[in-house]
């Protein structure tokens, strides 16, 4: 029987490793999360215990295992049109405002997870184009994630009924999806064409991504240390075009982290504009 217990020292060593690799801070009491996320890898990599796995990850003995462990720890659940208001603001305020510049609109989904956020953006763009023909120039959405398995899922664009039921209306499901068999649905090509998926560690440089008019970095900063939050936010400020916008998660704030943005109150919600 595989041992799935870990010592306090093993947990601390792995926590330091994870923060150094991708900025995620586990804190003092997330042993249960490490066990639940990494235990399946013990059998997959033919190890005898979770302790052996953590040792090999921390020491770098097995690069493939390291990648798999980071992948497992950075995979998070998400929803279609999460919190609703960011997509309302995108449609009713941000897209029209940026469109007035008469140049292509560039949007970044900074932690795309399994694709619900960037595809929700793409659906919002298509709905706006239908509602206001000719208003929008071309729109390009870049969606990034650190997890290779999540990016593969994003690119496939195939979801089961459980995933589809989390925030997606029957109307949008009918318009933007097609049958993929086995009770699953696939994002239509006109939605997929708007989104380019690529790997990105938020601890590393964003320079190769280019500049954006709008950045969604929602429900990501909550996992980072204050120093890491500041680093990410200041890099994102440098990645925005003049007057660009940043949207955070409903429980996230810039207070004490950066002075490069001004808060803009919407109805509902709050967004941030580059100074």
UniProtKB/Swiss-Prot annotation:
Amino acids binding S-adenosyl-L-methionine: 76, 78, 82, 117, 145, 201-202, 218-219
Family annotation (Pfam families): CheR (PF01739), CheR_N (PF03705)
Designated name of the protein: Chemotaxis protein methyltransferase
EC class (word): transferase
Entry annotated with the keyword Transcription: no
EC number(s) from the headed UniProt entry: 2.1.1.80
One example GO MF annotation: protein-glutamate O-methyltransferase activity
Domain of life: Bacteria
Organism: Vibrio anguillarum
PROSITE patterns: CHER
Reaction(s) catalysed by this chain's protein: L-glutamyl-[protein] + S-adenosyl-L-methionine = [protein]-L-glutamate 5-O-methyl ester + S-adenosyl-L-homocysteine
SUPFAM superfamilies assigned to the protein according to its UniProt record, in alphabetical order: Chemotaxis receptor methyltransferase CheR, N-terminal domain, S-adenosyl-L-methionine-dependent methyltransferases
UniProt keyword terms in alphabetical order: Methyltransferase, S-adenosyl-L-methionine, Transferase
GO biological process, one term: methylation
CheR-type methyltransferase domain boundaries: 1-275
Gene designation per UniProt: cheR
Function recorded in the entry: Methylation of the membrane-bound methyl-accepting chemotaxis proteins (MCP) to form gamma-glutamyl methyl ester residues in MCP.
SMART domains xref list: MeTrc
């Amino acid at each position: 029987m595989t041992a799935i217990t870990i010592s306090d020292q093993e947990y601390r060593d792995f926590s330091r490793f994870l923060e150094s690799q991708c900025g995620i801070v586990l804190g003092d009491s997330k042993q249960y999360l490490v066990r639940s996320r990494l235990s399946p890898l013990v059998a997959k990599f033919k190890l005898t215990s979770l302790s052996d796995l953590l040792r090999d990850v921390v020491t770098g003995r097995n690069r493939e295992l390291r990648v798999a462990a980071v992948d497992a720890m950075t995979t998070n659940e998400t929803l279609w049109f999460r919190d609703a208001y960011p997509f309302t603001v995108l449609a009713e305020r941000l897209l029209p405002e940026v469109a007035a510049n008469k140049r292509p609109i560039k949007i970044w989904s900074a932690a795309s997870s399994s694709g619900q956020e960037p595809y929700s953006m793409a659906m919002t763009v298509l709905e706006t184009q239908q509602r206001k023909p000719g208003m929008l120039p071309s729109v390009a959405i870049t969606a990034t994630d650190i997890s290779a398995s999540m990016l593969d899922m994003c690119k496939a664009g195939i979801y089961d009924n459980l995933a589809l039921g989390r925030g997606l209306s029957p109307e949008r499901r009918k318009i933007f999806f097609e049958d993929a068999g086995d009770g699953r649905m696939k994002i239509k090509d006109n939605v997929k064409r708007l989104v380019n998926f690529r790997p990105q560690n938020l601890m590393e440089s964003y320079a190769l991504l280019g500049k954006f008019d709008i950045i969604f970095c929602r429900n990501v900063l909550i996992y980072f240390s204050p120093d890491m939050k500041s680093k990410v936010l200041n890099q994102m400020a440098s990645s925005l075009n003049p007057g660009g916008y940043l949207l955070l998660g409903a429980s996230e704030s810039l207070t004490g982290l950066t002075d490069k943005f001004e808060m803009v109150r919407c109805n509902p919600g709050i967004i941030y504009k580059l100074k």
